[in-house]
Every structure is written in C-alpha cells, then in structure tokens.
C-alpha cells in the first residue's frame, strides 16, 4: 500500500507542509524534509520550482523564483533526494506544473519518482480527463498517487468524477484565489467544507490555501481529514531560517 494511503488511514488529523525545493538555499532540501518529519509533520509536498506558477501567491512565487536562481532543476532535485528514504518514512509528494515534467519526459519522471521513494504528485494544470486518458496507467505503474484540486466553483458532478479517478486524497482549495491570501475562513468557505464532507466521497480531502496557524488548521480539519500549510511556512523560512522548523510546527499542533 502507498505510504499516502497508509497515513490517511491513521486516526488523526493530517498536517502537510509545502516548500519550494532549493529554497532558501540550494542544498536545504533534505535538511528541511528531515526536520519536518522530526517535528511531527505527517506529509510533505516538495515544490518543483517553475517560472510561471499560476496558482501560487507571491510568497511561493518568490521562493520558486529564488530556487531557480539558486540553480534548482528537476534533475538536481532527484539527485538531492536519491537517499532520502534512508532517513525519512513519511509520505513525500512532488507538487509542480506539467511543463517541466513533460520536458523531463513523463515516463522518466515517474520512474525517477519511484526510484527515489516519492509517493505522489500534485500537478495543478494537468486536467483530470487528460490524465485519465494518457497518464494514469504510467503513474500507477510506478506506484504514484495523483492528487487533483477542487474549488468552491467545481460542480458536484465534476467532483464525483475526480473522486472516481483518484486513489489517495483530494486537494480541497479553500477559495478560488491564489495561495497565501486568506487569514481565516468565513461562513461561505466553512459551508463549502461541510458540503464536500457530506458528499461522502471515497477519497479523504485535505484543505489547502489559507492555513497559516493553529486556529486555521483546526478550522480546516473540522470537516476534512487534514490541511496543507505552504505560504506561512515559506515565510517563516525566509524570516527565521531552517533552524526554526521545529518551533513553527509545534505552534500548529
């Protein structure tokens, strides 16, 4: 069983942390992953830097740009991660846009993920139908879970279709805006979380966009299995460095 599925079966709320590989410094990637696991994080999303990240807010965009300037590439990321499973047990997901994966070669990328011990991918600009028709078989051959995003605007019919194609969790976008732009959830968002919960989907949902502290984590996990923190974590790295990871995580739980 995939590590993601094993983790989702645990009787606890899931905290997933996102960061941009190669930020703040090019060689921080492994240290950040190891420190996050030691701090009690359940799952990690490793951002594959891209020059045009459409869904990302300014904090993640800036970290992605800096990572590229630092010299991060897809090839280098896999090189950095080649021994990661000797020290890290929790699920690892690569989140990135489809262009760099296409350039690398989808088959080669998935093969490298499997060799490295990556458990899943989140590719915001890969449509579910294109995935199902052209890439699902390749992903599954290499043991990879593919995670799709849904928003408050996604129809119930579309959500059920995504649920039928998915085999891990569904990334529940808390609003239709970019990442890092919210500070708490209003009644409309809370009702949206509740509505999705009441659909009784086969895949659990994890909420992203707008979670930045203990309060918003608890709000997000009232109806869903877990929550993802990205912008707030990167902001903390920028201001306080890698040594602050344990303190940051301890203030969420």
UniProtKB/Swiss-Prot annotation:
Q: Which GO terms describe its cellular component?
A: cytosol
The enzyme's main class, written as a single word, is: lyase
Q: Which residues form the active site?
A: 45, 56
Q: Which UniProt keywords apply?
A: Amino-acid biosynthesis, Aromatic amino acid biosynthesis, Lyase, Tryptophan biosynthesis
Q: Which GO terms describe its molecular function?
A: tryptophan synthase activity
Residues annotated as coiled-coil are none
Which SUPFAM superfamilies has this protein been placed in? Ribulose-phoshate binding barrel
Entry keyword Amino-acid biosynthesis:
yes
Q: Which family does the UniProt entry place this protein in?
A: Belongs to the TrpA family.
What is the recorded name of this protein? Tryptophan synthase alpha chain
């Amino acid at each position: 069983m995939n590590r993601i599925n094993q983790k989702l079966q645990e009787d606890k709320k899931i905290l997933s942390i996102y960061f941009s590989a190669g930020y703040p410094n090019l060689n921080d990637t492994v240290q950040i992953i190891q420190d996050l696991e030691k701090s009690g994080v359940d799952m990690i999303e490793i951002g594959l830097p891209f020059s045009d990240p459409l869904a990302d807010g300014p904090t993640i965009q800036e970290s992605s740009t800096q990572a590229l300037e630092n010299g991060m590439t897809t090839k280098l990321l896999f090189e950095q991660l080649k021994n990661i499973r000797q020290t890290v047990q929790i699920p690892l997901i690569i989140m990135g846009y489809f262009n760099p994966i296409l350039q690398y070669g989808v088959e080669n990328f998935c093969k490298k993920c499997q060799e490295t011990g990556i458990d899943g991918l989140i590719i915001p600009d890969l449509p579910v139908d294109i995935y199902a028709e052209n890439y699902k078989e390749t992903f599954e051959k290499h043991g990879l879970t593919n995670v799709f995003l849904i928003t408050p605007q996604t129809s119930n019919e579309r959500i059920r279709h995504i649920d039928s194609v998915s085999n891990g969790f569904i990334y529940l976008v808390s609003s239709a805006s970019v990442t890092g732009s919210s500070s708490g959830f209003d009644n409309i968002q809370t009702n949206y979380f509740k509505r999705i919960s009441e659909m009784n989907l086969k895949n659990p949902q994890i909420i992203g966009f707008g979670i930045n502290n203990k309060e918003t984590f608890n709000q997000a996990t009232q109806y869903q299995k877990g929550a993802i923190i990205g912008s707030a974590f990167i902001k903390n790295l920028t201001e306080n460095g890698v040594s602050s990871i344990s303190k940051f995580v301890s203030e969420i739980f």
